[in-house]
């Protein structure tokens, strides 16, 4: 149904337009996107004729500073915090509204000699400032446009226009597919762009290495930072893992209440200890400790979920009532750490099939699933049963 990111990049490099869709739980819309560097009056005319939305120009913070583009409003109350600046027209234009003059304004924005005084305000071009980090920080069309431009090796600026149906309603995926077919345009999703970037870019940095004696044995501890969300993760390595043989690996998500306080609401603490003990017994392996508290929702939200569980909701229902998916964890950063450690073939300590799929999506091969089941307690029986029934965990209860 959708095209590959590589196909869209090739078209963009040729000055063509692509359609980019965002998540159905976000704006659930599609935009025409082109590279600002290659913009023409014909492309602008196509966008306003068949897109019918607002023509905007996503740019980096650097462009905004050079052109002295202040925020459109002092207090942004937009639900998605779309970063509009004041609208502009280049001083060489007349009304600034024609396709030709809008293209002129956009091209002059990219002119390194241009400065703030070269543009009238307000105008008919609406710059948008993309967040640093692009779609990995904010999954919006603004960031997608700048990311696509950078992936093409072009100036980091795009031209976007929302796609609206002839009857004035927003075009959804079925409408967008028809539009893409009608005009022979590549169509991609922001979700796929995120996956593409995570697959092709190195987001983790090995920061420090120490020897760490523990109650379970002595490990080589390696601390990692990541450029995606600034969270710090740690890998505990046992033995020589560079032989190319399958390595026993546990990817453990942080659980303060279980790992530190010994909470009986979950089985996290016992799983952590059992994994370390098993790796020590085998003499070779990795425990990757990921800062993904509460399946990715954070400590306070996990406690709020616990409160809802006390009111009768199960662990999945509690997450959903708080507005989160059942499992918000992302395995891309963990996969990059494992690859940095030189691992390729894993014997994965897990009861969670999604974790296997999540890691294998990043060119890691799970040779074997090694069960890690702890005895159920009265306090966590319902929790564990929900993980089986709703999250597909492989447990014998």
UniProtKB/Swiss-Prot annotation:
Catalytic activity reported: D-ribulose 5-phosphate = (2S)-2-hydroxy-3-oxobutyl phosphate + formate + H(+); GTP + 4 H2O = 2,5-diamino-6-hydroxy-4-(5-phosphoribosylamino)-pyrimidine + formate + 2 phosphate + 3 H(+)
Cofactor details (free text): Binds 2 divalent metal cations per subunit. Magnesium or manganese. Binds 1 zinc ion per subunit.
Site (Essential for DHBP synthase activity): 124, 162
Record bears the keyword GTP-binding: yes
Pathway connected to this protein: Cofactor biosynthesis; riboflavin biosynthesis; 2-hydroxy-3-oxobutyl phosphate from D-ribulose 5-phosphate: step 1/1; Cofactor biosynthesis; riboflavin biosynthesis; 5-amino-6-(D-ribitylamino)uracil from GTP: step 1/4
Active site feature: 327 (proton acceptor), 329 (nucleophile)
InterPro entries reported for this sequence: DHBP_synth_RibB-like_a/b_dom, DHBP_synthase_RibB, GTP_cyclohydro_II, RibA, RibA-like_sf, Riboflavin_synth_RibBA
Positions annotated to bind GTP: 250-254, 271, 293-295, 315, 350, 355
GO biological process, one term: riboflavin biosynthetic process
Top-level taxon in the UniProt lineage: Bacteria
Positions contributing to Mg(2+) 2 binding: 27, 141
Gene Ontology annotations for the cellular component aspect, listed alphabetically: cytosol
Residues noted as binding Mg(2+) 1 in the record, renumbered to the chain: 27
UniProt keyword terms in alphabetical order: GTP-binding, Hydrolase, Lyase, Magnesium, Manganese, Metal-binding, Multifunctional enzyme, Nucleotide-binding, Riboflavin biosynthesis, Zinc
Record region (GTP cyclohydrolase II): 200-397
UniProt: D-ribulose 5-phosphate binding residues: 26-27, 31, 138-142, 162
Cofactor: Mg(2+); Mn(2+); Zn(2+)
Gene Ontology molecular functions: 3,4-dihydroxy-2-butanone-4-phosphate synthase activity; GTP binding; GTP cyclohydrolase II activity; magnesium ion binding; manganese ion binding; zinc ion binding
EC number: 4.1.99.12, 3.5.4.25
Region of interest (DHBP synthase), ranges: 1-199
Record function comment: Catalyzes the conversion of D-ribulose 5-phosphate to formate and 3,4-dihydroxy-2-butanone 4-phosphate. Catalyzes the conversion of GTP to 2,5-diamino-6-ribosylamino-4(3H)-pyrimidinone 5'-phosphate (DARP), formate and pyrophosphate.
HAMAP family reported in the protein's UniProt record: RibA, RibB, RibBA
Family per record: In the N-terminal section; belongs to the DHBP synthase family.
Name under which the protein is recorded: Riboflavin biosynthesis protein RibBA
Organism, as annotated: Bacillus cereus (strain AH187)
The encoding gene: ribBA
